[in-house]
């Protein structure tokens, strides 16, 4: 058999087993662990003089109805919390991922994976020098402006989870869409937005009927927030309804400790599955020791991106954020004290360390309500890099690569939010049968600016050049909506997630919804142990005077970095 050098192979088909890829300008390196394409020398590749031609890599007679792929991503490097770091062809058909492996024509090629047959129905994305990830899920979104969708897609986020009705004071502070009428209007509004949505109802009610009517109107879960009273009684009532109707509950706890301390809130959870927002506390929650929640096996902890990674300016910007988001007045001393109680440098630094240890399982944005919706993937990779520089290699990493660390942070913005919300069987990873929400990145821009964003197997968002140019690449290049963002294709490639109660009561027909409507499921059995690569249960102590955080008896701290990767090199502002 003819042999070529590793360099020549990489030039032709991209990296393979043992090759390493640097992620942007960071110090993170991933190494390909497995090549799922079976054998070398029979690669499928699109282009002039390449192999994806009729009678070669393209099967002559197979129809789409009989199983021919709609789209193949060839020779791509997959970075996925479930799959690991692997080389593969990825096949898509009818908006779903068919599988990973070797694609092509089994009549002329050896080792073609079952189901990954290419033919006249198949289009191609050349993935040889690209990285493929699952579309990200932002689990903490205030629906303040519909233009958030554009910013989210521009950083590889394909699913939003939160609540609100626009730029009203309640939505500026709380991620809930309150009551049946507001839920109906929001479900109607998002019909034209090319991204998946889950809407949280207002969980702040000790009465049961107002909670149930929200689920039947299309809420996909609940949020309990301190601005509406996160009392133990409210939490218990909301969790009881959630248990009966199989939906998730997110909670923003009581910063002022008026109705109890963190131990009282944990007791109110009563061992039931609950998602704690911004578990560090700068975004809100029991001061100063909310971090104790990350050591509970029934609690699914997340935190938000404004403090990730903790840089030299992180603390300084938080005060004004809190004052604006929670309708506080800087002329009122008690309002100022409320804001100041949430800003603790020691716990903010510990937040990054706990993420690196896998103790905090998810990252959300807290969009326009302290966080930045277009930076969730970005902040995850920046934090991974900052922690490598501050703490060194993780014990789980193999010598010479950062695979485990990178996959840990990828899980925080993909599969773990999906599992928590009850949609992990549909999105969150690159697995057979899942919705083809996928993101392609050039390695130099990984985590910062995607090349293509696919929704339901069709390109929805892309970095596109001048439409009047002779090529797709001439300037000005910026993100533009693509065909999956237009017409009725939008409704076929984007999902609205609702409760099973709403789904069974025909919410789509009642409200005239044209998007794909799917019910959440399995939320009440999810615990910390299910958080992929992020299931660590430490013992947390917070000094009430200095706010120093000890994790299993060891002070959890690092020096804030003076500079951060994937930052000014990539942005004009």
Swiss-Prot record:
One of its GO terms (biological process) is urea catabolic process. Residues 135-573 form the Urease domain. It catalyses: urea + 2 H2O + H(+) = hydrogencarbonate + 2 NH4(+). Carboxylation allows a single lysine to coordinate two nickel ions. InterPro entries: Amidohydro-rel, Metal-dep_hydrolase_composite, Metal_Hydrolase, Rhodanese-like_dom, Urease_alpha_N_dom, Urease_alpha_subunit, Urease_AS, Urease_asu. Pathway: Nitrogen metabolism; urea degradation; CO(2) and NH(3) from urea (urease route): step 1/1. The modification N6-carboxylysine is found at residue 223. Its cofactor is Ni cation. Ni(2+) 1 binds at residues 140, 142, 223, 366. Its main location: cytoplasm. The active site is at residue 326. One of its GO terms (molecular function) is nickel cation binding. This is Urease subunit alpha 2. The lineage of its organism: Bacteria, Pseudomonadati, Pseudomonadota, Alphaproteobacteria, Hyphomicrobiales.
């Amino acid at each position: 058999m003819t042999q070529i050098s590793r360099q020549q192979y990489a030039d032709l088909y991209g990296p393979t087993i043992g090759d390493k890829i640097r992620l942007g300008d960071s110090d993170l390196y991933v190494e390909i662990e497995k090549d799922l394409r079976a054998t070398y020398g029979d690669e499928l590749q699109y282009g002039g003089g390449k192999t994806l031609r009729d009678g070669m890599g393209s099967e002559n007679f197979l129809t789409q109805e009989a199983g021919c792929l709609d789209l193949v991503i060839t020779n791509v490097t997959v970075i996925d919390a479930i799959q690991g770091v692997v080389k593969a062809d990825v096949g898509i058909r009818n908006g779903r991922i068919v599988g990973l492996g070797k694609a092509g024509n089994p009549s002329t090629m050896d080792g073609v994976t079952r189901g990954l047959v290419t033919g006249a129905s198949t289009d191609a994305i050349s993935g040889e020098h690209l990285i493929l990830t699952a579309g990200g899920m932002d689990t903490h979104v205030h629906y303040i402006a519909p233009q958030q969708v554009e910013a989210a897609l521009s950083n590889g986020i394909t699913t939003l989870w939160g609540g609100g009705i626009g730029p009203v004071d309640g939505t500026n502070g709380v991620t809930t869409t309150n009551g049946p009428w507001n839920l109906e209007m929001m479900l109607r509004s998002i019909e034209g937005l090319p991204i998946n949505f889950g809407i949280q109802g207002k969980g702040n009610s000790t009465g049961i009927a107002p909670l149930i009517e929200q689920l039947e109107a299309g809420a996909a879960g609940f949020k309990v927030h301190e601005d509406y009273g996160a009392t133990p009684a409210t939490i218990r009532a909301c969790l009881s309804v959630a248990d009966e109707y199989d939906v998730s509950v997110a909670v923003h706890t009581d910063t002022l400790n008026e109705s109890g301390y963190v131990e009282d809130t944990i007791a109110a959870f009563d061992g039931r599955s609950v998602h704690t927002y911004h578990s560090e506390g700068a975004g809100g929650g029991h001061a100063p020791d909310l971090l104790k929640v990350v050591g509970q096996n029934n609690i699914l902890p997340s935190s938000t991106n404004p403090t990730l990674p903790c840089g030299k300016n992180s603390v300084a910007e938080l005060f004004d954020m809190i004052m604006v988001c929670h309708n506080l007045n800087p002329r009122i001393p008690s309002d100022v004290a409320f804001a100041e109680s949430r800003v603790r440098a020691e716990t903010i630094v510990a937040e990054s360390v706990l993420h690196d240890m896998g103790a905090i399982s998810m990252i959300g944005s807290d969009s326009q309500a302290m966080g930045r919706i277009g930076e969730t993937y970005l902040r995850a990779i920046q934090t991974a890099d900052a922690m490598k520089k501050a703490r060194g290699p993780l014990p789980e990493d193999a010598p010479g690569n950062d695979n485990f660390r990178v996959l840990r942070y990828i899980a925080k913005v993909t599969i773990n939010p999906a599992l928590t919300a009850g949609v992990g069987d549909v999105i969150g990873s690159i697995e057979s049968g899942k919705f083809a929400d996928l993101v392609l990145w050039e390695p130099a821009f990984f985590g910062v600016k995607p090349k293509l964003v696919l929704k339901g197997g069709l390109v929805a968002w892309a970095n596109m050049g001048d439409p009047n140019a002779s090529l797709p690449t001439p300037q000005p290049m910026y993100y533009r909506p693509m065909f999956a963002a237009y017409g009725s294709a939008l409704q076929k490639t984007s999902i609205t997630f609702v409760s099973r109660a709403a789904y069974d009561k025909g919410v789509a027909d009642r409200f005239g919804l044209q998007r794909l409507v799917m019910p959440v499921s399995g939320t009440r059995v999810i615990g910390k142990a299910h958080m992929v690569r992020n299931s660590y249960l430490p013992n947390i102590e917070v000094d009430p005077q200095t706010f120093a955080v000890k994790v299993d008896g060891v002070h959890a701290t690092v020096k804030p970095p003076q500079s951060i990767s994937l930052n000014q090199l990539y942005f004009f502002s």
